């Protein structure tokens, strides 16, 4: 079959090679930065997949002492003696050439940065991303937060092939995950992190076995309007006490424990103190107090 393909087209050569390739031979480059991205990398390494290189953010000073800290992905990569690149600019010629020398068949992106086409279009089998929502819902930087803030009872995890517009590529696989009424963003994050690692492996296996049937996001059925998941800033986290009880409750758990919902406690003298609120309870009862009044039990 291979000899016949060599006489034919390049596509035929690629398809035959893909059919006979084993996971140990598939050259994978992995890109990610936070804890969420470590789980999938760990499962790839422990599963015997051939991770030939890791790309993560440059080291940055953190904390009051401004000490240089490694990203969680870098820490794991060093522990496993994996080759590592930390580019400042993803279009830098030196970085692109170093990446090309790894000769990746497939690239995997989990919680990293928006990639230029020169990077995501490099591997012969493409580049896929793991996104913490049921795309096309919650495209953007903070999908887990916004799903909880909006009071959703279900979210999920998606793998999709990268294209030019962010989070819009063809969907490969999805897993649905329930959100309990008491879940905060940390609980949902951890659920998706573990399932995401498994989904990455399943996606790699599907690509290896040539069983992928990607679906364009515009062809997917969506209930209701598409909701975005923009980056969250400090002012985004300010509680609006004029909102309904459930809205405030969901808002607090959707930002807990990080970056945390906040409000100002104003003294009779007019002095304001910022306080972060990590947990709340819904209580429905009649009262005559003004909205925003602080009531204590002693």
State the predicted function of each range.
Residues 1-15:
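Single conserved hydrophobic/aromatic residue that forms the stacking wall/gate
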Residues 8, 101-103, 123:
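Alpha-helix C-terminal capping/helix-to-coil transition sites in glycosyltransferase folds
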Residues 21-65:
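N-terminal Rossmann-like dinucleotide-binding module
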Residues 26, 47-50, 57, 106-228, ...:
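Donor/substrate-binding cores of folate-linked one-carbon enzymes
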Residues 33-36, 88-91, 111-114, 283:
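Short beta->alpha connector loops
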Residues 38, 42-46, 96-100, 117, ...:
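Amphipathic, non-transmembrane alpha-helical secondary structure
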Residues 61-105:
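N-terminal glycine-/serine-/threonine-rich beta1-alpha1-beta2 phosphate-ribose binding loop
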Residues 222-298:
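Internal anion-binding site segments
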């Amino acid at each position: 079959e291979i000899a016949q393909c060599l006489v034919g087209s390049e596509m035929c050569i690629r398809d035959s090679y893909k059919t006979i390739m084993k996971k140990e031979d598939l050259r994978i480059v992995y890109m990610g930065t936070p804890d969420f991205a470590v789980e999938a990398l760990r499962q790839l390494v422990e599963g015997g997949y051939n991770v030939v290189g890791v790309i993560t953010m440059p080291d940055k000073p953190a904390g009051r002492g401004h000490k240089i800290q490694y990203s969680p992905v870098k820490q794991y990569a060093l522990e496993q003696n994996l080759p590592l690149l930390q580019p400042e600019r993803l279009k830098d010629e030196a970085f692109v050439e170093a990446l090309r020398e790894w000769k990746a068949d497939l690239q995997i992106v989990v919680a990293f940065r928006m990639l230029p086409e020169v990077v995501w279009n490099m591997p012969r089998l493409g580049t896929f991303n793991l996104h913490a929502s049921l795309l096309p819902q919650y495209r953007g930087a903070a999908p887990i937060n916004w799903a909880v803030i909006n009071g959703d009872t279900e979210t999920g995890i998606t793998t999709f092939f990268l294209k030019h517009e962010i989070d819009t590529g063809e969907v490969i696989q999805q897993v649905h995950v329930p959100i309990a009424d008491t879940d905060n963003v940390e609980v949902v994050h951890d659920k998706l992190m573990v399932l995401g690692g498994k989904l990455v492996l399943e996606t790699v296996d599907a690509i290896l076995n040539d069983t992928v049937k990607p679906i364009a996001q515009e062809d997917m059925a969506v209930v209701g309007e598409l909701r975005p998941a923009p980056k969250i800033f400090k002012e985004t986290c300010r509680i609006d006490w004029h909102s309904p009880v459930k809205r405030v409750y969901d808002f607090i758990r959707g930002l807990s424990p990080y970056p945390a919902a906040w409000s100002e406690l104003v003294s009779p003298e007019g002095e304001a103190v910022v306080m972060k609120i990590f947990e709340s309870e819904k209580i429905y009862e009649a009262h005559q107090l003004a909205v925003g009044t602080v009531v204590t039990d002693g």
